[in-house]
Every structure is written in structure tokens, then in C-alpha cells.
Amino acid sequence: MSDSAYQNHLSILRKRFDQALLETDFDGVILASGRLTYYFGDDHSHPFHPYAMAQQWAPFDLMPDVFIHIQRGETPRLLWPAKQDFWHVVYPIPEGGWCDQWRVEPVSSLQEWLPQISGKTAWIGPEYNEAPGLNPNLSVNPEALLHRLNYQRAYKTEFEIDCLWRANQAGAAGHKAAQAAFLTGKSECDVYRDFLAASGQLSNQEPYPGIVALNENAAVLHYEKKNPLKPDAMRTLLIDAGAAYGGYASDITRTYTAGSGLFAELIERVNTLQLSIAAQAVHGKAFSELHQATLAGVANILHETRICSLSVEAQLDKRIPQVFFPHGLGHLLGLQVHDVGGHQQDKTGTLRKPDESAPFLRLTRTLEKDMVITIEPGLYFIPMLLDNMVKNIAGHGCDLDLIETLKPYGGIRIEDNVVVQEGRSRNLTREAFSALLA
């Protein structure tokens, strides 16, 4: 990645933060990466994930107890922990051209630098109980400033999009290995191990815990287990797993089947629908409209495969598609898998919640250039939702005998990471899979 892309990224961040500080009457802001936290009653720490707002400024993964101080109109400061420790790894300050744009200072404690900061200052990130007592001018996590910064996070810089592309490359490599493992009959646990190895990461480095679901388990949307035992039959693999690069996440889902027949046809139809919706994710399009188009697309699949005899319009009226596709179409993607600001309509924090027909939709904004989103339609055979349909929706028109034959397959989800552009979209995930074949 070029130094110029990072320098441009840093310049954009400085302008955004300077403007937000001016509008909220702050002189500066301190961003905290966070500190290690521990399991209750234990000296064993949780896996560390730096606070995203701090990570956004750095071209490398942040460690605990790193602070970034931005003073309006001045060169940003990176305060790096200078520890003497023979129990743990002591991380040196990373080298490179990035530091030409910074004041880099090794520090041993908050007491060493926090009392010297003057002016009205915001503290954003995990709270340090001792911090307010060291500087009376601190305001901890002020909402007005957070609203402005969270809203801007949706618009990705060239540097950020490149990080997301690299995360997709790693994730796609893992998915190809997972597919091969499934086709050779491996267990969920072994499929997961192959994914991690091919994507070049450990489980604690994943941007989110990977989902590896065989057969009926694919009907559990966030299936947490990874069974070490092989099932009697290998019908379906649904894998929802990503990778990270520079703190930026890929979020990729694929569904595979070992055979042919109706379920294989359903996978192809969902894939076609997914590509169509992803291509429509362009500047000026309301994301809620894309979700409604996806519901209509699911209804069409149900009708054409004779799973439901009702017309598309009748299905939508009775909310049949939501039985088979109960989650939202997608979300903002970036430093967090479910990136911030999805319901936020402006910089002051005005929210637009999803309507009752799509209660789980994580993104209600109109799409704009340089947003990065996921597009993830699904079609599942979830016993609880199907039972509710039979009990509560008269004249549902669904072929319950046919559905019984599909329940052992669990379900389908196909998910890509898409950059919104003017007049077209860029599908990072499809590009990454294509690059593996080049």
C-alpha cells in the first residue's frame, strides 16, 4: 500500500476531526485504544481489540494503552506505551514513512502527559477511571462529538477501501479452503481450522467469530458451535467468516451443497438474486428499497420453485418471505463488522429506525459514494419460524411436504462486501474470489 494513500487518509481524518471539534466547541480530543480486560476472578485476559476510532488513525494494529491526541490545527500525537517487562512482549514503535506525519512520544503512564494537556478536551474510547482526576478539562465520550465522528465513518477513504480489499483477499482464500474441506467430508471443527490456516489468522484475530454450519445447523443464523464430529451425511456447508487487515474487516458468507436437486437450484437462485441486488447498490439508492427488492426476490424464488403457490404480491402482503429470510439485507462495514452509524441520518445523531416489516435492518441510510456495505440475502428453513407460519398465517400457500425435504439442508446465505459508487458498485468479494483463479 502506498504511503500517499495513507497520507491522504490522514489528511481527510484531520479535516473531519477539526471540523467536528469546532462545531462542538472542543479544542482537542484524546482517542484511547483501550486496556486489557480480564475474566472474572482470573488473571487471564480477554482477546484485545482496539477501539475502532483510535485504530482508524493508524496504519498498523494498535496495542493496549495507546493514545492519540488531536489538537485542532496541530500535528497529531501518538502516545506509545514505553514499558519495561520481562513477562510479556514489549512492542516497539512501528517504523515507516507514516511517522513523518506524527509526533510520536513514548510514555510510561497517564500521569506523565495527561495533566499537561490544555484547553477543553474530549476523551473518546474506553474509560480510564483515573483520567478525569488528572485533567479537569476532560469531557468523557461527549455525544455531540461522537455523533459527528460516527456519521463520517461511513465514508471510506482510498486507504480504507484498500484495507477492506486486502481483508477480502484473505477471507476468500479461507473460504476456498473451507469449500474443499467440506467436499472431502471434514467436520465443522476441521473446516474451521482449514479456513483459519488459508486466511492466515488465528481465531482471536478474526474480526468476528466465524460461523461454520453443516446441514440443519445452517438454519441457525448465528450458529456458534463447531462440532468436531462428522455428520452422517454431508448435505450443506454455510460458512460466514472473514479476515482483517489493518483493523478493517471482511464479512463473507458462502453456501455449498454436495449434491444436485432442488437445494442446489435454490443456492444458484439466491446467488443470482444477490448479484442483482449488489449491482443496484449505487449512490442515491435507499438501502431500505434494496431490502424490499430482496424480499420480492425471495418471494419470486419461492413461487418459481413451487415452495409457495402464492403470487409474489400475495406473499409480500402476508409476509411470507420474512419466514424464509428473517434478517436484514446488510450493514455498513469497516473497522467494525457492523460498523457504526447505520441508522444515523445526519451528523447531529438523528436516527431512523427500520419499519416493522424489516425490524432487524441495520442500515436505513441512503447509500452514498464510498460507503462500504454487505449484501447478504438468505433463504432458510427454520423450524420455529415455519411452525409460527403454519399457526398464524392463514392461506400461507406453502408446500409443507416439500419444505420437510429441505429442512435437513438448513439454509442458504450468500454475502459480499460492496463499495458504493456513482452509477455502479464495486464488489470486493467477487473480485477477491476471481483473483484466486488468476
Swiss-Prot record:
<dbReference type="Pfam" id="PF21216">
    <property type="entry name" value="PepQ_N"/>
</dbReference>
<dbReference type="GO" id="GO:0102009">
    <property type="term" value="F:proline dipeptidase activity"/>
</dbReference>
<dbReference type="InterPro" id="IPR001131">
    <property type="entry name" value="Peptidase_M24B_aminopep-P_CS"/>
</dbReference>
<protein>
    <recommendedName>
        <fullName>Xaa-Pro dipeptidase</fullName>
        <ecNumber>3.4.13.9</ecNumber>
    </recommendedName>
</protein>
<feature type="binding site">
    <location>
        <position position="331"/>
    </location>
    <ligand>
        <name>Mn(2+) 1</name>
    </ligand>
</feature>
<feature type="binding site">
    <location>
        <position position="251"/>
    </location>
    <ligand>
        <name>Mn(2+) 1</name>
    </ligand>
</feature>
<feature type="binding site">
    <location>
        <position position="415"/>
    </location>
    <ligand>
        <name>Mn(2+) 2</name>
    </ligand>
</feature>
<dbReference type="InterPro" id="IPR036005">
    <property type="entry name" value="Creatinase/aminopeptidase-like"/>
</dbReference>
<comment type="similarity">
    <text>Belongs to the peptidase M24B family. Bacterial-type prolidase subfamily.</text>
</comment>
<dbReference type="InterPro" id="IPR048819">
    <property type="entry name" value="PepQ_N"/>
</dbReference>
<dbReference type="GO" id="GO:0005829">
    <property type="term" value="C:cytosol"/>
</dbReference>
<dbReference type="GO" id="GO:0006508">
    <property type="term" value="P:proteolysis"/>
</dbReference>
<dbReference type="InterPro" id="IPR000994">
    <property type="entry name" value="Pept_M24"/>
</dbReference>
<keyword id="KW-0645">Protease</keyword>
<dbReference type="GO" id="GO:0016795">
    <property type="term" value="F:phosphoric triester hydrolase activity"/>
</dbReference>
<dbReference type="InterPro" id="IPR022846">
    <property type="entry name" value="X_Pro_dipept"/>
</dbReference>
<comment type="function">
    <text>Splits dipeptides with a prolyl residue in the C-terminal position.</text>
</comment>
<keyword id="KW-0482">Metalloprotease</keyword>
<keyword id="KW-0378">Hydrolase</keyword>
<dbReference type="GO" id="GO:0046872">
    <property type="term" value="F:metal ion binding"/>
</dbReference>
<feature type="binding site">
    <location>
        <position position="251"/>
    </location>
    <ligand>
        <name>Mn(2+) 2</name>
    </ligand>
</feature>
<dbReference type="GO" id="GO:0008235">
    <property type="term" value="F:metalloexopeptidase activity"/>
</dbReference>
<keyword id="KW-0479">Metal-binding</keyword>
<feature type="binding site">
    <location>
        <position position="240"/>
    </location>
    <ligand>
        <name>Mn(2+) 2</name>
    </ligand>
</feature>
<feature type="binding site">
    <location>
        <position position="415"/>
    </location>
    <ligand>
        <name>Mn(2+) 1</name>
    </ligand>
</feature>
<feature type="binding site">
    <location>
        <position position="376"/>
    </location>
    <ligand>
        <name>Mn(2+) 1</name>
    </ligand>
</feature>
<dbReference type="Pfam" id="PF00557">
    <property type="entry name" value="Peptidase_M24"/>
</dbReference>
<keyword id="KW-0464">Manganese</keyword>
<dbReference type="GO" id="GO:0004177">
    <property type="term" value="F:aminopeptidase activity"/>
</dbReference>
<keyword id="KW-0224">Dipeptidase</keyword>
<dbReference type="InterPro" id="IPR029149">
    <property type="entry name" value="Creatin/AminoP/Spt16_N"/>
</dbReference>
<dbReference type="InterPro" id="IPR052433">
    <property type="entry name" value="X-Pro_dipept-like"/>
</dbReference>
